[in-house]
């Protein structure tokens, strides 16, 4: 089968649209080529947040949800919305895996540990879910409950953990003082996803051991305040255990529930907790560290990865079918996914709705087994934070992409540029401006080769906003995602795009339309191309 035109879907992760002004790194980057394209090609401003991507109304978009909807061609009720519903109906008290876990703790006279990102960011988790699980455990009759809190500062304002922890302490007080905060760790450590095992080790050891030389506290609020005084945001709070809590560490016969619902930043820690064959256990950072996974019951809220060897998943997956990638493969067409390390799972696992991974039992979410599909993985730079290298690996991605384009082998190429999101999350406005400028240059390189020389079409869009709002309402740095609209640019002067309810869930059907292919019935969103 031949396509009418090959397509590159270029996902500018975190590139939103807002009025120009101080703190708008996208507008202030003097993106000459993007402006040129917007004057030359059809484009629309599209929704990438809230109900348009299966989230609660007003909830900012995120990379996982954005990539799912870019590939799905339909609006899918996301994990946040599902778990919010469970909170409303007391569903945690009827969930078989959770109830069995409560029974396990009772039978073993042990402790229930609740670990997770404790904030209202709603990207990887929501504090209300952990609180609701806690209340369910209390109703069940558990009295030994410990919280292993991961502080955010990235999908929230930089310094709000004190506020959230105070709310939790009040909840504990309202429930007869059942429960204690056992440990606190910034997400930089506990939610690393780039195999920086020394970060994971700091959080793991804090939760599983009580060594004299480890950071510790006796008052969680004072510990967070001290971190602020030392110039640390919530994200960077050094892992520490509560020395005033007897047996604060995870012990044999305890149960742990990881309350994060988004997989990518949960996989590494959950794998370390459950799988002694995971590569971290061969790393120097884990030398002489005890593996606890064979002595506890570990529960993940959602399916994270096969490397997480615990069999207990509270809410097993229901994969999407006939996503763009799966459908393209079923037609015998060739496709390529390309991204740097930080985002490879987004152009594979998330873009495919988890379908290829869950169906075919891949070892890693970032792998792909779809017929006629290939991956080019470019390493992310090894820096502490990406404002130190705002160009990230965008140039290397483009170099590799242009090599592939010149082969004329692929009908569809899906690529991710991470700069606006990953540099934007540092809160460094100047660095983010530099990152955006680099992307403008790379888009021109791709356009001039693929569109002008190979008669291809680029569909340029984003999964959510971020870099367009770098300063928050207080005048401080904004590190979190936004509810801004995002662009959808199609480099084909022969078409016209409808601006009726534009949303990123319409990207997949639009791509199929450009390629001259039938849109499968599972894609309930229409193409944006106006039929003449």
Curated annotation (Swiss-Prot):
Gene: gpmI
Binding site for substrate: 124, 154-155, 187, 193, 262-265, 343
Keyword Isomerase: yes
Record: residues binding Mn(2+) 2: 13, 63, 463-464
Assigned EC number: 5.4.2.12
Cofactor(s) this protein cannot do without: Mn(2+)
Catalytic residues, chain numbering: 63 (phosphoserine intermediate)
Listed name of the protein: 2,3-bisphosphoglycerate-independent phosphoglycerate mutase
Similarity comment text for this entry: Belongs to the BPG-independent phosphoglycerate mutase family.
Keyword terms: Glycolysis, Isomerase, Manganese, Metal-binding
GO cellular component terms attached to this protein's record: cytosol
GO process terms (BP): glucose catabolic process; glycolytic process
Alphabetical list of InterPro entries matching this protein: Alkaline_phosphatase_core_sf, BPG-indep_PGM_N, Metalloenzyme, PGAM_B_sf, Pgm_bpd_ind
Catalysis performed (reactions): (2R)-2-phosphoglycerate = (2R)-3-phosphoglycerate
PANTHER family: 2,3-BISPHOSPHOGLYCERATE-INDEPENDENT PHOSPHOGLYCERATE MUTASE
Note accompanying the cofactor annotation: Binds 2 manganese ions per subunit.
Pathway: Carbohydrate degradation; glycolysis; pyruvate from D-glyceraldehyde 3-phosphate: step 3/5
UniProt: Mn(2+) 1 binding residues: 421, 425, 481
SUBUNIT field: Monomer.
Function, as annotated: Catalyzes the interconversion of 2-phosphoglycerate and 3-phosphoglycerate.
Highest taxon in the source lineage: Bacteria
Single GO term (MF): phosphoglycerate mutase activity
């Amino acid at each position: 089968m031949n396509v009418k035109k090959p397509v590159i879907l270029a996902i500018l992760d975190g590139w939103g649209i807002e009025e120009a002004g101080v703190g708008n790194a996208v507008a202030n980057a003097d993106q000459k080529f993007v402006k040129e394209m917007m004057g030359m090609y059809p484009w629309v401003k599209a929704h990438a947040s809230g109900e348009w991507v299966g989230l609660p109304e007003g909830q900012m978009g995120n990379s996982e949800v954005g990539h799912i909807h870019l590939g799905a061609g339909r609006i899918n009720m996301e994990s946040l919305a599902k778990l919010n519903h469970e909170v409303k109906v007391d569903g945690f008290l009827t969930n078989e895996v959770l109830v069995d876990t409560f029974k396990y703790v009772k039978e073993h006279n042990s402790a229930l540990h609740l670990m997770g990102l404790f904030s209202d960011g709603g990207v990887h988790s929501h504090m209300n879910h952990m609180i609701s699980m806690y209340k369910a455990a209390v109703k069940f009759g558990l009295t030994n409950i410990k919280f292993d809190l991961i502080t955010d500062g990235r999908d929230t304002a930089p310094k709000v953990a004190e506020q959230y922890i105070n709310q939790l302490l009040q909840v504990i007080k309202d429930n007869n003082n059942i429960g204690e905060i056992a440990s606190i760790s910034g997400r930089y450590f506990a939610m690393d996803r780039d195999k920086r095992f020394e970060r994971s080790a700091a959080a793991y050891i804090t939760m599983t051991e009580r060594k004299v030389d480890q950071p510790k506290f006796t008052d969680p609020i004072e510990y967070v305040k001290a971190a602020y005084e030392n110039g640390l945001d919530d994200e960077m709070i050094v892992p520490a255990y509560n020395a005033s809590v007897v047996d604060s560490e995870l012990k044999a016969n305890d149960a742990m529930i990881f309350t994060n619902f988004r997989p990518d930043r949960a996989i590494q820690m959950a794998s370390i907790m459950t799988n002694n064959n995971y590569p971290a256990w061969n790393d120097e950072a884990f030398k002489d560290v005890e593996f606890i996974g064979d002595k506890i019951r570990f529960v993940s809220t959602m399916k994270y990865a096969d490397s997480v060897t615990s069999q207990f998943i509270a809410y097993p997956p229901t994969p999407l079918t006939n996503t763009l990638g799966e459908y393209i493969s079923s037609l015998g067409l060739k496709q390529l996914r390309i991204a740097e390390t930080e985002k490879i799972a987004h152009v594979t696992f998330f873009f495919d709705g988890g379908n290829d991974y869950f169906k075919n039992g891949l070892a890693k979410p970032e792998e792909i087994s779809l017929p006629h599909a290939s991956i080019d993985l470019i390493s992310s730079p090894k820096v502490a934070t990406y404002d130190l290298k705002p160009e990230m690996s965008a140039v290397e991605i483009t170099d590799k992409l242009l090599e592939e384009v010149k082969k004329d082998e692929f009908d569809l190429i899906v690529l991710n540029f991470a700069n606006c999101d990953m540099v934007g999350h540092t809160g460094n406005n100047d660095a983010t401006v530099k990152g955006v400028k680099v992307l403008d240059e790379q888009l021109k390189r791709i356009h001039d080769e693929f569109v002008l020389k190979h008669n291809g079409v680029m569909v340029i869009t984003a999964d959510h906003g971020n870099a367009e709002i770098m300063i928050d309402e207080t005048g401080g740095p904004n590190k979190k995602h936004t509810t801004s609209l995002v662009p959808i640019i199609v480099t084909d002067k022969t078409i016209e795009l409808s601006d009726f309810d534009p949303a990123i869930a319409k990207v997949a059907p639009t791509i199929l339309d450009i390629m001259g292919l039938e849109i499968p019935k599972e894609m309930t969103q229409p193409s944006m191309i106006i039929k003449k």
